[in-house]
Amino acid sequence: VSKNAVFVGDNNSGKSTLFEAVDLVMGPDRLSRSPVIDEHDFYAGEYLANDTPVQIKIEVTVIGLSEDQKIYFGNHIEWWDRCKGALISGPPASSTDAESVEPALRLAFQGNYNLEDDDFEGQTYFAETLREGSTPELFRKKDKRNCGFLYLRTLRTGNRALSLERGSLLDIILQMKEVKPQMWEDVLNQLKGVSVANESELGVSDILTSVQDSLSNIVSYEAADKPQIKVSNLTREHLRKVLTVFMGSGAYHEDGTEYLTPYAHQGTGTVNTLVLSLLSIIADIKENVIFAMEEPEIALPPHIQKRVISTVIEKSTQALFTSHSPYVIEEFLPDQILVISKTNGHLTAAPAGMPPTVKMKAFREEMRRRFCESLLARRVLITEGRTEYDVYSTAAKKLQRLHPERSCSFDLLGIALVQANTDTQVAPLGEYYKKMGKTVYAIFDKQDDDIRKKIEVAVDYPYEATEHGIEDVVLKGVNQEALLKYGLKLVEDNEWPSHLSTEAPRAGMEFEKLYKTMKAFFKHKKGDGALAELIEYCSESEMPEFITETIFAIEKSVYSLQTVPVMIEGEV
């Protein structure tokens, strides 16, 4: 993984799984969770194979160590060759002097189901001590804190950030600054003297007295004497959970004092920004920090999203993100965008790289406008241009409304559309997406044999039209009566262009003339979505057969790879 990176992909593609795996190895507080792993951490929930426990093994190699880390982990240092992307496994010792070689720390997690205890177990180790003949040495909590790995699952977890619960961001800061609040005894003593609702007129004390009288008929009076309501359990652990920070809300009492609310009651964006401020403090305290952050865009406007990314990158040794936001993704170089894909439990990541024909100076704009959605999807449909993009997406949505029991919409099929801008770029784009492990579809005009063959090799599902342009695909395939009605409606609504007034559609117009004048109209309106508007105007039987059959074929291909839902069994 490069110094900084963003992992992108469809939902459930494995982005969070990757971060969870690293957290199992390096998270200081992760092993305190009980159990440390469970049934669902195993592929398909299978933690036994023929009554033999299945092992979960995770290995992480950390490079770019600070001088303090090199000293602290001195006995466990190995050597990493950046050019080969591998550890140096043996002599000669002089190989460690190469410029491309640097110290590395290899760490491992091993976990499994324990048959004897009927429970799951797991532990982290310095990986080199797991070699045969060596004594395994634990990678302990103190060691993990020296690695500086911080995992923020999503900013929605901010409800604990400013509490004093163990593992909260505020607690981490206090530990790192070696601040130990000597307040618990004072607070507990104060709270012990506070009773709630003791006044008889409130009626609560009378009820508690009745409870005591009822209990005395069952157990001795010493066992349940003088019930009272207290502020908390009066333990340090419970105080950690209930104490929280209050902040000004912007509202004021009549006496001019500001009304304070628990910080979690602030706006979501404010809470998220507070969390990031705490992370910034942590980064300032530690020399080497590796941030792993999920979806930093939640509840933040685009300009704040960008600021978050730049701030975290600036303050960390390495920053890793997951995201679905184009404003986050465009902040990274093409090789820093890692596209995650998963097939039958096998997880792969490939750098997005530079899309074909896109120049570096236009990368950010093109990423946001054309490519971001397709990088996040499992399946991609390539169209030649914007008009084709609009026509096929409109037709698919129309068919979805007509057949709600099916899955015709590209959104429901998990397919992102991307336009190639020209027929010669369909094949290069297909290769670009297939390299990332995506299923690639392409709909294109009738082509010469050479271009057709290149496209067929480059994509998984090619669909070639019978005409040499999208206008002809629609005009020659649409129902003639529907086309005339649409043309007459344009005239009636005063939407027919004045320079074509002598050729305006009229009742009884021959199809050849209608075809010619409507083609001129659509050429004039190219890029305005007029052709897609015609598709929206048509009923299913009036739509071009090539378009409807292609959409149904795409639907069928998606479900042929899965268990076919009952609603679409049989022929389409």
Describe each region flagged by the PLM.
Residues 1-27, 246-373, 559-572:
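Switch/communication elements of ASCE P-loop NTPase nucleotide-binding domains
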Residues 5-6, 150, 380:
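Conserved beta-strand position immediately N-terminal to the Walker
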Residues 10, 48-53, 98-102, 142-145, ...:
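Conserved catalytic network of the ASCE P-loop NTPase/AAA+ motor domain
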Residues 20-101:
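Conserved P-loop NTP-binding catalytic core
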Residues 54-58, 103-107, 145-149, 317, ...:
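Short glycine-/polar-rich loops that comprise or flank the Walker A/P-loop
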Residues 65-186:
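Electropositive, glycine-dotted interaction segments
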Residues 161-164, 173-274, 278-290:
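Extended helical coiled-coil dimerization/tether regions that scaffold
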Residues 369-382, 386-572:
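Acidic, Mg2+-coordinating catalytic modules of nucleic-acid enzymes
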